[in-house]
Amino acid sequence: MTILDKRQIQRFASDTDIETLSKAIDDDGVAIVRSVVSRDVIQRLQKEVESSDQPVWLEDNPSLKDSKFPSQARHANNLVPASKTYRDDILNNSAVHTTCKAVFRDVGDYWLTTGILRTTKPGSPAQGFHRDALLYPVLQYQPPTSPPLTVALLVSMTDATVANGATRVILGSHKWETVGTPSEDQAVRAELDAGDMLVIHQRLVHAGGEHTHQAPDTRRMLLMFLTSCQLVALESPLALSRELVETMTPLAQKMVGWRTVRPVEPNTVGLNTHRSGCLEDGLKLRAAKPLEGQDGH
């Protein structure tokens, strides 16, 4: 396998346009968007999740008792009911949606498949190089030239450094036929300031780094996995109460599967419908007022 050059990950402002982000992701398979969320949002999200009366920690889930989680890491999901900040600030974040429109421009609407708040402490081991499309086995049959159907967004809640495990990524590896056996000298580190977002193409070869004892503080990150609306979500919308969903904006409702979505043609009726019409109309679903700049759909 040819060793790629050591170009670094391209970094963009949070108001960068769709076309610019699209080109970077197409070329490199990865990008960093700076200052996507504020420290206030990060602090509120962390507090709400860690104090939630909802079951959030995967390590405490009896159905996952045989899973081998590193003892120095914790993983929280079920974030929609657990955190108002997640529902209001994260699911409506304009930079998140601009990025998703850049990724999914050829396939239509997208939605959230799962969100995970991950913490690591010193001693958390490095991951092996991999791709993120494991949830959907059908994706292994896509050729490298196919448009992506999934994307991973990593929002750093603390600074991400080499010492605390900043992600290793191999630029351009989304164009490889297989993962193969990459070497460390092919990778660069995705060092991030708190609030920055790392964008990972579904085929990009990457790996979390080791959280070394040189970085004694806990590292926190929000991992969001989004897919084309043509793929079913990992976290079922049936688990969300209507009462909770009706406190959310129309855009956030669509992200969690409570509205009709639109892939590209030749589909003309949408997906997730009610009698071939809009689900939200059939349910007479209420919603919070759209945020400024949102179209309410």
Curated annotation (Swiss-Prot):
Fe cation binds at residues 130, 132, 206. Homodimer. SUPFAM superfamilies: Clavaminate synthase-like. The keyword Membrane does not apply. In A.calidoustus, the austinoid gene cluster lies on a contiguous DNA region, while clusters from E.nidulans and P.brasilianum are split in their respective genomes. Genetic rearrangements provoked variability among the clusters and E.nidulans produces the least number of austionoid derivatives with the end products austinol and dehydroaustinol, while P.brasilianum can produce until acetoxydehydroaustin, and A.calidoustus produces the highest number of identified derivatives. Pathway: Secondary metabolite biosynthesis; terpenoid biosynthesis. Its EC number is 1.14.-.-. Coiled coil: none annotated. Belongs to the PhyH family. The keyword Nucleotide-binding does not apply. It holds the Pfam family PhyH. It comes from the Eukaryota. This is Iron/alpha-ketoglutarate-dependent dioxygenase ausU. GO terms for molecular function: dioxygenase activity; metal ion binding. One of its GO terms (biological process) is terpenoid biosynthetic process. It comes from Aspergillus calidoustus. Iron/alpha-ketoglutarate-dependent dioxygenase; part of the gene cluster that mediates the biosynthesis of calidodehydroaustin, a fungal meroterpenoid. The first step of the pathway is the synthesis of 3,5-dimethylorsellinic acid by the polyketide synthase ausA. 3,5-dimethylorsellinic acid is then prenylated by the polyprenyl transferase ausN. Further epoxidation by the FAD-dependent monooxygenase ausM and cyclization by the probable terpene cyclase ausL lead to the formation of protoaustinoid A. Keywords: Dioxygenase, Iron, Metal-binding, Oxidoreductase. Its cofactor is Fe cation.
